[in-house]
Amino acid sequence: MALRLVLGRAGSGKTRLCLEEIKAILAEGPAGPALIILTPEQATLQMELDLHRAAGVPGFSRVQVLSFRRLGWRVFQEAGGAARPHLGEMGKAMALRAVVSAHRDDLGLFAPLAGSPGFIEQLAHTIAELKLYRVTPADLDRILERYRETGREQTILARKLRDLALVYRELETYLAGRYLDPDDYLTLLAGRLPEAAFIRGARVWVDGFNGFTPQEEAVLQALMAVAEQVTVTLCLDPTLRHRRLGETELFHPTGETYHRLRQLALAAGVRVEDDVCLAGTPPRFREAPALAHLEAHFGRWPLRPFRGDAAGIRLVAAANRRVEVEAAAREILRLAREENLSWRQMAVLVRDLEPYHDLIVNTFRDFNIPLFIDRRRPVGHHPLVELVRAALEAVLEDWAYDPVFRYLKSDLVPVPREEIDLLENYVLAHGIRGRRWRDSRPWQYGNSRDLETPSPPGSAAGETINAIRERASCHLRRFDGALRGRQLTGREITAALFDLLQELGVPERLAAWSRQAAAAGDLDAAQEHEQIWEGLMDLLEELVLALGDTSLELEEYAAILDTGLESLKLRLIPPALDQVVAGTLDRSRQPELQAAFVLGVGEGVLPARLPEDATFSDREREELRAAGLELAPTGTLRLFHEEFLAYLALTRSRRYLWLSYPLADAEGKALSPSPLVRRLRQLLPGLREETAGTELPGGDDDLVYLTTPRQAAGHLARLLGRGRPLPPLWQEVYRWLHQDARGQKMLGLLEGGGYRNQVDPLEPELARGLYPRPLRLSISQLETFAGCPFRYFLSYGLGLQERRLYQVDPAGMGQFYHAALKLFVEELGRRGLDWGRLSDNEAAAIISQVVDSLAPALQHEILSSSARYGYLRKKLEQTLQRVMEVLNEHARRGEFRPLAVETSFGCRGKLPPLQLDAGPGRRVFLEGRVDRIDVARRQGRPYLRVIDYKSSPTTLDLTAVYYGLALQLPLYLRAALDAAPELLGEAAEPAGMLYFAVRNPLIRQRGPVGKEAAARLRRQELKMRGLLLDDVEVIKLMDREIAASPDLLPLRLNKDGSLRKGAPVAGREEMALLLDLALARAAELAGAILSGRVEISPYRRGQETACDFCPYRPVCAFDPQIPGSGYRRLGNLPGDFWQLAAAFLGSQMKG
């Protein structure tokens, strides 16, 4: 029984000494007492590999490489003592939550925090620390008693200790005799070690530790008392072992460990052998003088500069983290290719992995560098975790849209994603949730947008949706049925969840994913899919152990399980032997490195700016220490120990050290280098600091960019994008890519350098198949094409439509208004009422009746689905009431009366279509729906006007008509005039075309306004706007009071009865010219459609563009900055509109 301490600075050969000793013992004979190597858990695999190489034998059974926990498993297996169920960290957190919930009324300071996010985790962390340092509830009581004696029982610290003692004691009572707390594992191990026969006479080497917790120290003390010899290696300058080191000294952590171990051995009556001191220049740096100097003088003051060349050390300042990682990846590739280093001989080290993880993974994948990230893998993103969370949330939130489709899109529900997408569109369009999911009756909703004649349910599409719904929801419905409306225990809820996972075939699906990932070479993903099921089952088992017989509300169960899922992490092992390992300074263990890449050497990162503990402040820790309660080091001491971590990082490799730091973060905020950088410059004056920027290649150092074909092609594409001649080197790269099979796959990137965002016209055959003859078009489709041909192609050629949602959008409101105004006119006809004699009260009553009849048909009773939509219903009715007051005034003051409302013209309409001649063999039927066609007679001759309802004030823009962007009103009037013989039995004259805004305008006035004045102001705001026939008498048929009250139409009369200058009117010939122009422009646009034009060519008029509110921007990716992809600019007309219109028609006639 003896303790031996092996001391040496970094690289002095401590691990090598242990392995050589084991090799020598094995050479004497394979049989004998156990040889045990005790290492940190994350280092066991590496140690086994190093042992295999050092021993030089194919295998051995006498040597065991163990961590503390694995040692415990071996001891308990032989000596017993751990028969109770092992409660893991997650199970303990669940038990702690139950304890806190049961004793919440007894808590003081912690009571208001008990339900806060993260509180249970922090409390579990604190109790774990207490156990780690062998502090019992009785120890806390002892400190509290001192506080009471000194009248300090109401201090914050005393109140914390009181609550901690209460929770700690109750947790111990809860677990006692039932479960084994993971934080008691090492304490129990220390007690059982003497009873383990394989330890007696064993030789133990403890390597890779810089310090031990009191629990680990107790295990080591027990080992010393049983084993033949315990050898502990410490990274400590042997010359410093005879004195206690100050907290700021470099080797303070290991110096304290050295003295503690000697005290433990003496206390146990164990002989302490002479220290093995490994002095002199560490063997690791014999071929690297600069690294040797750095190791020897890093922690010494005053600094001694190195007079030689700083060969093997590079210091790089990078523009940002992405550039930093790319520069490191290029150097790793160079070392592998030119220096013949294997991947495993290089490692990437960071103090904080979080900001670098994704950058390292993505960059190394792009550079084809095999990589293993050394960390416990969080799995909150995994589909299985998402499935479990979503299933519970779906039941809790009564089948709300979000959790239901998160569940379905986990890819663990046996329904194809295409069918889930169809189901999702249907659910969103019809607002389905809650009992409508759980109801066994089929869904029956029409899909028509026509409020008056909705499409019948029960169609083939409806049957398909119901079949998908059944397959998608049947398992979740059974799960819901097992949980809803019942008081259940944790065991019963867990059983229902397990049944759901089994019914879905989750284990089989995960196994298949694992096989697929392995076949594709993604061994990390294969391990993840393989381990996640086991991890979840362990978590559920712990939950049942901790809370199986406890009655839980489902919400509480879900919160507890979610806490466990958040902390669930997988322990992946490197899937291959030859990989670059990336990890944190305090975790990674790679002793035989040839090159170390230390990234992120920034201020506040290395040394790290450590957060203060949430339970005990540094001042409180010092106070407890003075009272005899030893806990984890204070933040100040941990900050001093960061220096030691930095020392280990800088001395990890034999030949090559890369240090880098970013100058800015991802948002461009400036970052500063670590103070270590300044010290490095002082220690190594010959070290030249390099920069890695974001500039494009094209200079003297371009060879560094030729790392992989993919990377070279990417840089080449950026150079081509400059539009300048390529430098000679890159011309060679371009030629190589064209000639090499691998390089040809990268040509798509090269073409990006000369990218032009344009689409070729459709082939004639394809255009004929896409647009059947004769082509039927609506006027809005023509206007869309005039705005941008590609938008027309996507919307009407390919049929891409925005997803319909269960909401009242502007289109739905417009639909409602149109239907209400139509029904109003029809109700007048049914009752035989003259609109001109109708009072506002009578009109309001009819409108109210119309709204009552239409409201249920809008989006499947959406207006009665919530209080918010109930309020919207009132606003819709109020708007219609205001609008009707103005329309009533029109009827009272004019002779025009509705002849037809919401009347369709087209092949299947009430009126015949407009026929267009779009070229030889290209007949086009133009279809549409006119909101209102009004008629009045003068001297026995009928006059027609058309009215188009809009949601906002709109005027007839003749320039927009000329360009084909506003054809509706002229073509509506043309369709009405063409249909006049059918409607009236005789031809009719055009009276005008008008827009009417259906809205409830907000009138701003400084003072109070009377009822009549307010009505007049509303009429002025709701004036009809458009183009009227230049005939005062016809205009008076619309408003006989226009001379006195010009508040209905967009014009005024002079005192002599003539029209004022600038009035929007046109003579009969001009009106006919306008209608002919609109028809000719429509024919031209229709011809372009049939010709297959689909170019991305949005118009721009002033600040208005076709891209405004266009839903297809993500599809076309239009960017006016790309050469050749600018807007099609439409300016003001270069002359008189009527002359230009006549000229256009003349050119069309000649063509």
Curated annotation (Swiss-Prot):
Residues annotated to bind ATP: G8, R9, A10, G11, S12, G13, K14, T15
Entries under Pfam families matching the protein: ADDB_N, PDDEXK_1
Keywords on record: 4Fe-4S, ATP-binding, DNA damage, DNA repair, DNA-binding, Exonuclease, Helicase, Hydrolase, Iron, Iron-sulfur, Metal-binding, Nuclease, Nucleotide-binding
Note on cofactor: Binds 1 [4Fe-4S] cluster.
Residues reported in the UniProt entry to bind [4Fe-4S] cluster: C788, C1107, C1110, C1116
Cofactor requirement: Mg(2+); [4Fe-4S] cluster
Keyword Zinc: no
Any one GO MF annotation of this record: double-stranded DNA binding
Span of domain UvrD-like helicase ATP-binding: 1-273
Signal peptide location: none
Record-linked InterPro entries: ADDB_N, DNA_helicase_suAddB, DNA_helicase_UvrD-like_C, P-loop_NTPase, PDDEXK-like_dom_sf, PDDEXK_AddAB-type
The UvrD-like helicase C-terminal domain, residue ranges: 282-578
EC number, as in UniProt: 3.1.-.-
GO BP of this protein: double-strand break repair via homologous recombination
Subunit record text: Heterodimer of AddA and AddB.
Role this protein plays: The heterodimer acts as both an ATP-dependent DNA helicase and an ATP-dependent, dual-direction single-stranded exonuclease. Recognizes the chi site generating a DNA molecule suitable for the initiation of homologous recombination. The AddB subunit has 5' -> 3' nuclease activity but not helicase activity.
Note, other: Despite having conserved helicase domains, this subunit does not have helicase activity.
Protein family (similarity comment): Belongs to the helicase family. AddB/RexB type 1 subfamily.
Protein name listed in UniProt: ATP-dependent helicase/deoxyribonuclease subunit B
Source organism: Moorella thermoacetica (strain ATCC 39073 / JCM 9320)
Name of the gene this protein is made from: addB
